[in-house]
């Protein structure tokens, strides 16, 4: 007996976003006395009693995303899932007195932000937490997208948080030469600049509310954009350096476009991973040129020159910014770039500009060679 034919997968929409980060205008880049005067991009977030900072960032972003969605109460608890992750947890354990690791041990796991949100909301549907370094947040969205398309859910809260602005983690990134030595915002060179010399670390929480067509029919929410497709690959090249050719990252982008039914020529904007490291920026340029060609291409920018590199949260944060950019028709500028790398100069949006087109891409590339591409379309 043949297997039953699967129905056409439903379309998936983003109906709300929540962002807790340093200001998107770059004004939050400041010398940090806790980090020996280096620049950092700290977020402002109120803490609840006995709440780890990582949880607070995830909670605040989730509350933003859900603030205008009371109609979700009409969906059954098992029709809603939480896909909020972190690349690491418990960083405060390494910079102070040993915490109580008894019943509170779970709070220091990378999966704990999502667990805390599930418990608070009472959502019992599927949920996954997968730490994949700087691709964590983007991967969380992809997993939620897949489960929604399979009909396992009608709504999902997906995203990530990062709270790693601690002396130990800063020293670790400094030791591998990834951090900018700048101690004043005016000295910082942003992503894709000829003189870029590393990134500034930031922290953030970001959450996106995803709903299937069936979910939308029940909640009545207005979609911001449609999540058309996604893909992930791995370089299998090096633990901290990307493949200089960008072969697998380019494959992820091509696969995501193919799943979305979109040609490269239809992409109006790419929110690049763009960290400001020489090896990372050049590899990503190879990705973009490999997929979009050598002539006219999409507009490109990275927001890390404004908010810092938020590590595991970056994929979710940048996806949320991409969603807002597409919904509002405005491309965020690539802050801190004074002299653009020649191979990308003609595509780079140095300042905010209008977006002409209906499709945008968010790219994430994480340590370990993890690559994720997300493709969004106007709703």
Regions found by a protein language model. Name each.
Residues 208-212, 280, 289, 350, ...:
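Short beta-strand-to-turn element immediately C-terminal to the catalytic PLP-Schiff-base lysine
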Residues 152-176, 183-197, 230-244, 274-281, ...:
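Acyl-CoA/ACP chain-elongation machinery
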Residues 8, 31-59, 88-96, 100-143, ...:
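Conserved catalytic cysteine-centered active-site region
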Residues 57-69, 111-113, 212-213, 245-260, ...:
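Short, well-ordered amphipathic alpha-helical segments that serve as non-catalytic structural scaffolds
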Residues 4, 21-86, 90-91, 252-264:
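Conserved active-site "lid/cap" helical segment
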Residues 59-62, 68, 121, 128-162, ...:
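Active-site-proximal alpha-helical scaffold in enzymes
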Residues 14-16, 34, 62, 82, ...:
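Conserved small-residue
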Residues 9-42, 184-260, 269:
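Condensing-enzyme catalytic core mediating Claisen C-C bond formation in acyl metabolism
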């Amino acid at each position: 007996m043949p297997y039953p034919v699967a129905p056409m997968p439903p379309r998936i929409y983003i109906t709300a976003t929540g962002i807790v980060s340093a200001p998107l205008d770059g004004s939050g880049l400041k010398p940090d006395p806790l980090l020996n005067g280096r620049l950092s991009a700290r977020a402002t977030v109120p803490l609840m009693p006995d709440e780890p900072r990582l949880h607070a960032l995830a909670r605040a972003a989730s509350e933003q995303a859900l603030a205008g969605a009371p109609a979700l109460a009409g969906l059954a608890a098992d029709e809603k899932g939480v896909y909020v992750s972190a690349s690491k947890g418990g960083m405060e354990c390494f910079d102070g007195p040993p915490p109580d690791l008894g019943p509170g041990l779970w709070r220091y796991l990378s999966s704990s932000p999502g667990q805390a949100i599930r418990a608070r909301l009472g959502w019992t549907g599927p949920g996954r937490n997968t730490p994949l370094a700087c691709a964590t947040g983007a991967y969380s969205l992809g997993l939620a997208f897949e489960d929604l398309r399979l009909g396992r859910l009608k709504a999902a809260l997906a995203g990530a948080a990062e709270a790693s602005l601690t002396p130990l983690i800063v020293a670790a990134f400094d030791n591998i030469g990834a951090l900018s030595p700048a101690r004043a915002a005016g000295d910082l060179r942003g992503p894709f600049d000829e003189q870029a010399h590393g990134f500034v670390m930031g922290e953030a929480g970001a959450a996106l509310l995803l709903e299937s067509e069936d979910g939308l029919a029940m909640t009545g929410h207005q979609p911001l954009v449609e999540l058309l497709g996604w893909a992930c690959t791995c370089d299998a090249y090096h633990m901290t350096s990307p493949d200089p050719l960008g072969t697998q990252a380019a494959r992820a982008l091509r696969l995501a476009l193919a799943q979305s039914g979109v040609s490269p020529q239809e992409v109006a904007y790419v929110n690049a991973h763009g960290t400001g490291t020489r090896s990372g920026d050049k590899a990503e340029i190879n990705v973009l040129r490999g997929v979009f060609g050598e002539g006219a291409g999409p507009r490109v920018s990275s927001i890390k020159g404004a908010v810092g590199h938020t590590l595991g949260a970056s994929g979710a944060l940048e996806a949320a910014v991409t969603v807002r950019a597409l919904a509002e028709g405005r491309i965020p500028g690539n802050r801190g770039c004074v002299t653009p790398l020649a191979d990308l100069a003609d595509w780079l949006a140095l300042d905010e500009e209008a977006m002409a087109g209906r499709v945008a891409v968010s790219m994430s590339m994480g340590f370990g060679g993890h690559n994720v591409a997300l493709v969004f379309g106007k709703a």
